[in-house]
């Protein structure tokens, strides 16, 4: 198997299983080691790939000769695993959010640059097949502003409800919308943000915002606001609406887009597996 990329996984939960399915489609990959604190998870992953199971990522990184490591853990669990993988010369794929502090993120980034290693983060939406068409249309427009959304209910996992373990919805979920906005519109130069609580007062051990709004100014002068909400029990909205001088674009998260001009409507839906962006 020396001709294959030897991959190890830190974390074998929900998002890791999403990636497992794509690993199985890539012939040049050999998942050789898996690590998780939950016995059932790591046992199942180990059997799936005939990989060596570990409970401690430190032991895995010490014993295995890995080319790359996937880090698929809850936000607050990023406790040095990336830095140790970098020390061992491993390329990285880190699920978002990559860190809950800029200090740690900057340390990882500096380590990657010093070693000349490749790093990817779990922002696959920009690799949807219709996104180039969407971006090409927007690049020709005079854009007034946009509104983005990640509004829905509250995920059931325990760590999502606490700021110290999750970072809040804007950090853990809406980060996909922020990434798409940066891909479509460029870099941000100014930010204003507001949030509120008091809607989800029947949820135990919950201390993040129920709703928030982040207004940004981009290098081009464009302004846009992205909303987050985890309070909606009757449906929500994920995507971006862009209002232009000569048209309007409605992007549905991982679904497609609709362009409306004065005498024309263009619609497109995804036909590819966005997870293959990894």
Language-model-detected regions and their locations in the chain:
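N-terminal Rossmann-like dinucleotide-binding module
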Residues: 1-49
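Beta-loop-alpha module in the N-terminal Rossmann-like domain of NAD(P)-dependent dehydrogenases
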Residues: 19, 51-111
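Hydrophobic residues in well-ordered beta-strands that form the structural core
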Residues: 55, 94, 119-121, 147, ...
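Rossmann-fold dehydrogenase core element
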Residues: 106-124, 142-148
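C-terminal glycine/acidic-rich active-site capping loop/insertion
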Residues: 124, 238-278
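Predominantly a Rossmann-like dinucleotide-binding segment in NAD(P)-dependent oxidoreductases
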Residues: 125-205
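Contiguous beta-strand/loop segments that form the cofactor/metal-binding neighborhood of enzyme cores
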Residues: 179-256
